[in-house]
């Protein structure tokens, strides 16, 4: 946890308790529920080579005299995927931005990895609420040596509702500001994944 009020647990079933239809519905994002922070934490594990990190909100608390009272430190909870699987996922996520549905998150000259998301909202009485969606885009940059990860999630956007249409452009615009502020220069690859040919 992150020690904030209102923090929720996600819904992710134990494979031992699942049936074949559960696997099929989970493959398209149904039957799973995570908070934005939980989703970003999972994406960071892909970005960093497989380590699930303990998130923290406060980087450092410093007293007036300069004494460090508390400091957030990198804490690895466990390895959740191998480096090889993480690399394969990074490559696929980079193609989402360079070739797939996440092109609206692309910034010329930068290697960005990402994933679009469009989820139906649950109705109060069960089932799904007609015309109500959560649109998201999550990603990190640079795709080959990640430094920054971000999630943009819109609850019930009006008009267009796909993550690629509404969330990815916000991700791109925000990321451009971060890259500029941090002085991160474009890669020589002009934003395209390196070819293995």
Placement of each model-derived feature along the sequence:
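Amphipathic oligomerization regions
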Residues: 157-178
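Beta-lactam-recognizing serine transpeptidase/beta-lactamase-like catalytic domain environment
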Residues: 1-154, 167, 193-197
């Amino acid at each position: 946890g992150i020690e904030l009020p209102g923090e929720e647990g996600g819904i992710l079933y134990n494979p031992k308790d699942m049936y074949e239809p559960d696997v099929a519905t989970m493959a398209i994002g149904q039957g799973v529920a995570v908070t934005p922070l939980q989703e970003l934490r999972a994406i960071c594990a892909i970005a960093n080579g497989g380590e699930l990190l303990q998130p923290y909100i406060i980087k450092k608390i410093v007293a007036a005299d300069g004494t460090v009272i508390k400091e957030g430190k990198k804490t690895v909870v466990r390895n959740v995927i191998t480096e090889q699987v993480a690399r394969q996922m990074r490559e696929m996520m980079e193609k989402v931005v360079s070739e797939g549905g996440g092109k609206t998150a692309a910034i010329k000259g930068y290697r960005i990895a990402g994933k679009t998301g469009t989820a139906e909202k649950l109705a109060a009485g069960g089932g799904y609420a007609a015309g109500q969606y959560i649109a998201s885009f999550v990603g990190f940059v640079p795709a080959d040596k990640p430094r920054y990860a971000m999630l943009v999630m819109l609850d019930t956007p009006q008009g267009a509702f796909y993550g690629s249409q509404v969330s990815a452009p916000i991700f791109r615009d925000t990321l451009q500001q971060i890259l500029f502020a941090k002085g991160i220069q474009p890669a020589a690859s002009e934003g395209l994944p390196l070819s293995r040919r």
